[in-house]
Amino acid sequence: MNRARFAGAVAVALITSPASAEDLFDLKPVADGVYAALARPATPINCNAAVVVYDEGVLVVDTHSRPSSARGLIQQIRGVTDKPVRYAVNTHFHWDHAQGNHAYPVAFPKQVAIVASEATRENLKELGMQRVKDQLEAGPRQIAALKERIAAATDATARKAIEGELAQQEAYLAEIRSLELTLPDLTFDKSLILHRQDRDIVLLFLGRGHTSGDVVAYLPKQRVVATGDLLHGWMPFMGDSYPPEWVATLDALDKLDFDHIVGGHGGVKPKSHLRFFRDYLADLIEAVRAARARGETLDQAKTSVAAVLKPKFDAGMDGRFDGSVGANIEKVYRDLEAKKY
């Protein structure tokens, strides 16, 4: 599709699917038939999704934190196309990317496949429900803390905002009490190529990184990648990660020819963001190694390493550097302490 035709299609899509205050996502056209469903702020968070409309149907990358969020996106997709969702891809097993799986076979019975790497299916099978149980245990404490904040709030606007968070947290907890965790029913080892009439959709496992099973969806003709939390616009969560391998996996991703990144969080990014994100991880590992070589304790390393990284990376992390860098330093420090790499 030439640029003029694509611009016209975008205009039609925006006219036929206006955003509303109730929408959970902002659908942003990225390329011909490719949309970024950017998650609006919510408690708990949702991830972004990529929506690919092809000749016979729709492919969605990631299913969010709960079925109601997935249903919300399905409704928004119906404002763009009446084609059914044929594939829902889990980029990895984390709760905010896969707990909405069940909504898709309910909405599209016998029509949709849930797709993931073999490692992600195994992670969901082994760890998914335990993560749900962890959330059920933590939920009442989070609700109690929000109620304390409401009681202590002196500003009416702030109180109203916290009350909104409380309502969302209570609704989330009620929903996941009866959550059915639907496992992927189509898996692959290294790659799966969907040859559609109007495009190829290439699903790739390039190596371990954010988790042991991260999947990338690559659209070579449209020059777009959807990357989940392997690569996104926020500071990385590293709790289940393999840091040196993550750098190598991003180097492999860098070899693909694309212009646009639809990551699991934050906005749509240009390809240049890959190098920025990759360098953060590489510099983090190097700086923690140096701190340990100087004999620094973990607390000392948190201070010194953050000071090294902040000037280069703070501005590109969507205001989340200070809140996450300490946990990232601790992850690498503990891994090095355990001689994992």
Regions found by a protein language model. Give the residues of each.
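Active-site neighborhood of phospho(di)ester-bond hydrolases with catalytic His/Asp-centered motifs
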Residues: 61-63, 86-94, 115-118, 206, ...
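Conserved beta-strand hairpin/beta-sheet module of binuclear metal-dependent hydrolase folds
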Residues: 28-79, 215-229
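Active-site HxH/HxHxD metal-binding segment of metal-dependent hydrolases
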Residues: 78-184, 193
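Core dinuclear metal-dependent hydrolase active-site scaffold
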Residues: 29, 177-183, 187-219
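Divalent-metal (often Zn2+) His-rich catalytic cores of metallo-beta-lactamase-fold enzymes
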Residues: 244-300, 304
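Bacterial N-terminal signal peptides
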Residues: 7-17
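C-terminal regulatory/interaction regions
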Residues: 293-341
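Active-site-proximal loop/helix segments of hydrolase catalytic cores
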Residues: 200-256
